[in-house]
A protein has these predicted regions:
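Conserved acetyl-CoA pyrophosphate-binding loop and the N-cap/start of the following alpha-helix
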Residues: 88, 96-97, 101-109, 119
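Acidic/histidine-enriched, glycine/proline-rich intrinsically disordered or flexible terminal extensions
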Residues: 165-208
C-alpha cells in the first residue's frame, strides 16, 4: 500500500448504494450464510444516533474500496450514570484489497477524526489481533462488561479504546450494542433482493 494511492472522505448520498454493495461483498458468507451488514448500514443512516460527520469512505483509483461509520452509544455505569461513548462499524475493505494495510489506514484515520469530534471512548465487537494494533484493549480491562454475557464467559471479542485519555477512569459498568444494529432478518432478505443474486453458503468459522 502507498499512502498516496488512496483518499478518505465523508460519505455522500450518492455513495450509498456503492457502499452497501461494498459491505455486501466484504461480509458475504463470513459470519453467516449471506450477510446483514449492508442492510444494517442502510438502516443506520436514518437513526438519530448515527453520526454523519464520521461516516467515511476510502477511494482508490476512483472506486470506493472501504467504509466506516460511527454511532452514539453509552455505558450504563454501576453508579447509575450514563456515560456517553461511541461505537463503530460496520467497517470493511473490498475483498481484493484486504491484508494490504488499507483497513488499518482507514481505521486510524477514522479514530483520529472521532477523537477530534469529541468522542471520549469507543466500545465495539472485534478481533484484538487486528484492532489491538490501533490502540484497542479488552473492555474488561477498563471495567466494562458486555450486556447479557454471563460472568466468566469469554469476552475477548469485546473491545474498548479511550479517545480522550482517562475518560473512563473510575468507571465500571455495562455496555449494550445500540438497538439500531439489530435488524429484522426478513426485511434484510427483502432488501437484499435489490442486489444481484449471490449464493448463501454455510461455511466453517461462521458464528451465526
Amino acid at each position: 500500500m502507498n499512502k498516496n494511492d488512496y483518499t478518505i472522505r465523508l460519505e455522500t448520498p450518492a455513495d450509498y448504494r456503492s457502499v452497501e454493495t461494498l459491505a455486501r461483498e466484504s461480509f458475504w458468507n463470513v459470519y453467516r450464510p449471506g450477510c446483514l451488514e449492508h442492510y444494517v448500514l442502510h438502516c443506520l443512516r436514518s437513526d438519530p444516533d448515527f453520526v454523519p460527520q464520521l461516516s467515511f469512505v476510502m477511494e482508490k483509483d476512483g472506486e470506493i474500496i472501504g467504509q466506516n461509520v460511527f454511532v452514539r452509544a453509552h455505558i450504563t455505569a454501576d453508579d447509575g450514570r450514563e456515560i456517553p461513548i461511541m461505537t463503530m462499524g460496520p467497517i470493511c475493505i473490498a475483498p481484493q484489497w484486504k491484508r494490504q494495510g488499507y483497513g488499518k489506514a482507514l481505521l486510524d484515520y477514522s479514530l483520529e477524526k472521532a477523537a477530534a469530534f469529541g468522542a471520549g471512548a469507543l466500545c465495539f465487537e472485534g478481533n484484538i489481533d487486528f484492532y489491538g494494533k490501533s490502540g484497542f484493549g479488552f473492555a474488561s480491562d477498563f471495567g466494562i462488561r458486555y450486556h447479557g454475557l454471563p460472568e466468566g464467559e469469554d469476552a475477548s471479542f469485546f473491545l474498548c479504546r479511550e479517545l480522550i485519555p482517562g475518560y473512563l477512569n473510575g468507571i465500571t459498568g455495562e455496555y449494550a450494542t445500540p438497538q439500531s444494529y439489530f435488524v429484522d432478518e426478513s426485511e434484510a432478505e427483502a432488501f437484499d433482493r435489490q442486489f444481484p443474486p449471490k449464493e448463501k453458503l454455510r461455511l466453517p468459522g461462521q458464528i451465526f
